[in-house]
């Protein structure tokens, strides 16, 4: 065996005074580290450079270590910590390049789990740096939650630099069988080197400074021995991740959702756990960058952030819940893979037999290949068109039963909610179906069979949104072409040729178009309520929602088309379809009578000059002749008919009127908080309740004046007749028209 170089300094392992000679990897005498013998192969040049750096460090300490200036202390500590980390990194790289030793990591949990010093793992030797009794006491003292090794590394009171450092783990290096890689100290053979890991060199450490400049206590200074069982910890983390997904408590808006699945936030970490957590956080940061590309509101265009080859994979807006469920599954699968990778890393690092010396385990953690998400990590989304149906295809790993089951449960739960909305107005609703062949899971959502054709035709694919979209049987394109007028504007020119034929076709197309509009409104209402809660009830019109501005910039043509119909002045701003205004007064009779939330569809019933449905179908009446209707519309388009001024009116159902009347009898004036509660209870807006109470108070004052004069109001004389009439009316046909302007 060769001897150590004669110029090397023999360090004292537990002397923490300021005058301790430097040796091995120690950067400063104040750093409470265990000395490391230097390999002879490092050469004199490496030793001289190390001594020069040590002299510089000592000079900086004497110059900056002023008890009255804590900022300089902190600055020196940061400098020394970073320099110390660089020294360790250069030492490891040098030894690895010379193949003198191999770094094998052993967590402190593998040491402390042994009750006796004789049962120390094979890779750890107690013949070198630590006295036998101290090491035995450290290994046997496992009852306390405080690190039993910390008292041997506690610096003196004069040691300002290392006052808050704690020894958390060791690293051992095995000596190769070749005699050239042998190291000695004090003429004794030493096969392993030890060093204390400085926790603050970690990029993810939680050190901070308070207002006085003192550094806060590190929460990970003490190791909880109850959490050393990594296998059970990983299993618990996996169960928690599943529960988070099943209970739908996983947030999707930012990288904070990933913190809910971080398995080591609540654990006191050993060195191996710190290294793995550092790798894990890097993976989470990379995943968060992908997460930022995911649309966080329904105003965003639906893009697949994982499939790099489909940057513009737009999907119908009513399939967004399925995509959210898919996103949950992707996050679960990603975290599960990350846990499996970390579990494999720990298993390779803690095996106590000779079989663990594989190519993977012989690498240091810094050389271990990091698990980072890329396009191949996640299962891509693909859309397929078959016979007019839009199907969503998702690839799932074959044999991953948990992911498949979770995927199916989430999709079915979302499908149940959507089926209630989409089944309105269509009899042959296909709903949700799943199938799996050769590891591919198909989520089939068919929009074929909607009256007046499919919303999304087979010609509308990922990169063809700007192309012409033709829907047979509809009076206008849905969604419309960008920057083009609606196809329904060409109908008046055709009416002069054959008004009888064109009139009947136009009436059929009009009825279909109205059903399509109502179906669209129903879908958007459910989607908005699902995302924004009761915010829809506070705003009477969709374009007055707070997120309407972002919707106008959306890439989803369906949302653009929908919002353009409620506000014609904004239509040119975001490329919506232009329509010719008309007038009318009998749109209400054409609406179905089974609306669950009439407040939302009041805007469709409104005879407003800016309303799409009232402008195009306002003059239509069920009792009118379609020929005369066509003629009136043609004359109006030519400008021969003067437009009438129409008021924005609201129609209240019988239940709403009774609820308002009951509240008015108990209280004539309603405060704003109570008015909002009443509006929410009756599915009305705050403005509608306010205007109703104003009109009702006006009638109430007139009744009082007439009673004072000895007169009986006219509506009281016919009150019994009106009550009988209300009993025979249906909720969709009755209503009180009130001026809300």
UniProtKB/Swiss-Prot annotation:
Residues 63-78, 630-639 have a biased composition (Basic and acidic residues). GO terms for molecular function: DNA-binding transcription factor activity, RNA polymerase II-specific; sequence-specific DNA binding. GO terms for cellular component: nucleus. SUPFAM superfamilies: Homeodomain-like. Its main location: nucleus. InterPro entries: H2.0_Homeobox_TF, HD, HD_metazoa, Homeobox_CS, Homeodomain-like_sf. Residues 79-92, 363-375, 616-629 have a biased composition (Polar residues). This is Homeobox protein AHox1. The lineage of its organism: Eukaryota, Metazoa, Chordata, Tunicata, Ascidiacea. The gene is AHOX1.
